[in-house]
């Protein structure tokens, strides 16, 4: 299995266009050691030619330009992107579908809850209906494994996770199963497994077992502390109120990751305020000392 990180930041990217927090100001002026990042999305493949896109960020055009394997150039109009899987209906994970309209019809896999949001609150399925067949909806049934045509060896098993629907969704304060999923992606040829959960709000025993049995885990790294938005003065909500598990301290994701013998542990979907973006920070050093990597745009993993 080939994994390519198209984007590794949370909504707004890094630096965020209107933000002058220490991280954004620092990367913009070159006064901190940090990499600029686009909004989170990854691509997976079994052969390095045909790819499944996991989430479609607003930065998708630039991401696919940087990702050379996405354009095999076999004919006048071409792409290596075969299908899109949506983990949720967040704007930073779905607005890229509008940019992909020239490639319609496009197969899009998502849960019924996500499909409801994307036909009502943000009706992208309706908007693109007249673009050469539009978005072709394939329902993801939580807890039921599925395969995608063209990917003989990859199996996708969705898992319901605790998180939050987007602010525009009627499910925001009335959560439903299927608002957010994680994916277990199994390569039956190599017998390797990826656990991907960029919107993880809680880690329970089941998720710990799945992560322990995986060869690579790539999970939510939005915030270092639960009150980071408040402490930096850029917001009023905690990470948990937004559906994101913080990294540090008791109950943080790092305390769980440290219990795993999983070969590769990666944090993705990183907010612009998170100190781990500064590669000279003590927080970045702490992750490195514990064998946890910080995803960056263009990161490549082979399982």
Curated annotation (Swiss-Prot):
InterPro entries to which the protein is assigned, alphabetical: Metallo-B-lactamas (IPR001279), PQQ_synth_PqqB (IPR011842), RibonucZ/Hydroxyglut_hydro (IPR036866)
Nucleus in keyword set: no
Biological or metabolic pathway of the protein: Cofactor biosynthesis; pyrroloquinoline quinone biosynthesis
Gene Ontology annotations of biological process type: pyrroloquinoline quinone biosynthetic process
Intrachain disulfide bonds: none
Keyword Nucleotide-binding: no
Pfam family, one: Lactamase_B_2
Keywords: PQQ biosynthesis, Transport
Role, per record: May be involved in the transport of PQQ or its precursor to the periplasm, in association with PQQ biosynthesis, but is not absolutely required for this synthesis.
Family indicated by similarity: Belongs to the PqqB family.
This protein's name: Coenzyme PQQ synthesis protein B
Species assigned in the record: Acinetobacter calcoaceticus
Source taxonomy: Bacteria, Pseudomonadati, Pseudomonadota, Gammaproteobacteria, Moraxellales
């Amino acid at each position: 299995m080939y994994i390519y990180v198209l984007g590794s930041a949370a909504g707004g990217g890094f630096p965020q266009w209107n933000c002058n927090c220490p991280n954004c100001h620092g990367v913009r002026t070159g006064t901190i050691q940090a990499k600029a990042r686009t909004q989170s999305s990854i691509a997976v493949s079994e052969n390095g030619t045909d790819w499944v896109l996991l989430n479609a960020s607003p930065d998708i055009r630039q991401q696919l330009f940087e990702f050379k394997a996405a354009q095999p150039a076999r004919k006048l109009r071409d792409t290596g992107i075969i299908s899109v899987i949506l983990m949720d209906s967040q704007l930073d994970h779905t607005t890229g579908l509008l940019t992909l309209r020239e490639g319609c019809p496009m197969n899009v896999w998502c849960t019924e809850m996500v499909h409801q949001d994307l036909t009502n609150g943000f009706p992208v399925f309706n908007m693109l209906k007249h673009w050469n067949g539009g978005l072709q909806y394939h329902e993801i049934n939580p807890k039921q494994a599925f395969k995608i045509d063209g990917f003989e060896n990859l199996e996708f098993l969705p898992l319901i996770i605790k998180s939050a629907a987007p602010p525009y969704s009627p499910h925001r304060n009335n959560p439903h199963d299927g608002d957010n999923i994680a994916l277990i992606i199994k390569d039956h040829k190599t017998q390797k497994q990826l656990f991907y959960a960029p919107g993880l709000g809680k880690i329970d025993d089941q998720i710990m077992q799945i992560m322990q049995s995986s060869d690579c885990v790539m999970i939510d790294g939005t915030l270092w502390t639960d009150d980071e938005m408040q402490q930096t003065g850029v917001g009023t909500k905690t990470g948990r109120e937004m559906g994101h598990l913080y990294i540090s301290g008791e109950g943080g994701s790092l305390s769980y990751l440290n219990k795993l013998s999983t070969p590769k542990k990666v944090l993705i979907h990183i907010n612009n305020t998170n100190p781990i973006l500064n590669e000279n920070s003590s927080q970045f050093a702490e992750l490195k000392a514990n064998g946890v990597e910080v995803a960056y745009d263009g990161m490549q993993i082979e399982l």
